[in-house]
Design a protein with these regions (language model features):
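Conserved glycine-rich Rossmann-like NAD(P)H-binding loop of the short-chain dehydrogenase/reductase
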Residues: 24-40
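Conserved glycine-rich cofactor-binding loop
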Residues: 9-10
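Amphipathic alpha-helical dimer-interface segment in Rossmann-like NAD(P)H-dependent oxidoreductases
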Residues: 71, 105-126, 163-164, 216, ...
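Conserved mid-core segment of classical short-chain dehydrogenase/reductases
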Residues: 67, 82-100, 123, 143-147, ...
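Catalytic loop of short-chain dehydrogenase/reductase
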Residues: 83-84, 128-154, 159-168, 180
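C-terminal substrate-recognition "lid" of short-chain dehydrogenase/reductases
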Residues: 208-232, 237
């Protein structure tokens, strides 16, 4: 299968690319923004993979990629990329531009890429879309997460719309809701991590590799699995 992973050169995205690339039946395409060295190391490890440098904050860069994407036969799309940070200020201290910028850089590109992939999936009567969001959308998000959590909440509803509209075309759309992980994206200090561990049922943080395993599960699941959300949080937020 041809699988596209956005934001695939580092952190969770890299773990997903590595896990999916273990199967020789998969051709994994992934985007990266600035970390060419990391992208090259993945290509050395998995020669069948392909990397595309895309800046999701740049309309021209996205436009060029979407044009290239039209010629590719993407069977599975993993929407993972996020431009920016999760932690911010409280709502009353956050400039309105931070909300509009986050929407422009994270939601619009995702919609653009997803629309393009769906057009090909419709023709082939098959497709899987897996959206990486956050467990914060099913619980009260931490203080300062209003920008990040709001963009992810939009993607959550967008995914549900896709699952309904394209089920008859054998296209599924599901979400993975991971809890906090330690990656390049992480912003908590040692003290904050320690406090988090005190209340964690397993006394250990989630790893990117564990989340990647759930993505592989969704990839191999029946097309009956559609419109669902899988929280990965040790049962801390029961849906």
């Amino acid at each position: 299968m041809n699988i596209l992973v956005t934001g695939g050169s580092s952190g969770l995205g890299r773990a997903i690319v590595e896990k999916l690339s273990e199967s020789h039946e998969n051709v994994v395409l992934f985007t990266y923004c600035c970390n060419q060295e990391s992208a090259n190391s993945l290509l050395e490890k998995f020669p069948n993979d392909r990397a595309f440098q895309v800046d999701f904050c740049n309309e021209d860069s996205i436009g060029k990629f979407v044009k290239d994407l039209e010629a590719m036969q993407v069977d599975v799309l993993v929407n993972n990329a996020y431009a920016g940070t999760a932690q911010g200020a409280r709502v009353h201290q956050t400039d309105i531009s931070e909300y509009t910028t986050a929407f422009k850089n994270n939601v619009i590109p995702l919609i653009n890429v997803t629309q393009t992939c769906i057009k090909g999936m419709r023709k082939r009567k098959f497709g899987k879309i897996i959206n990486i969001i956050t467990s914060s959308v099913i619980d009260t998000p931490p203080i300062g997460y209003s920008v990040y959590a709001s963009t992810k909440a939009y993607i959550r509803q967008f995914s549900k719309s896709i699952s309904k509209e394209y089920a008859s075309f054998n296209i599924t759309s599901n979400c993975v809701l991971p809890d906090y992980m330690t990656t390049d994206f992480s912003i908590l200090d040692e003290y904050q991590l320690g406090k988090m561990m005190e209340t964690h049922p397993l006394k250990k943080l989630l790893t990117p590799e564990e989340v990647a395993s759930i993505v592989v599960y969704m990839l191999n699941a029946s097309q009956q699995l559609n419109g669902v959300e899988i929280p990965i949080n040790a049962g801390q937020h029961i849906v």
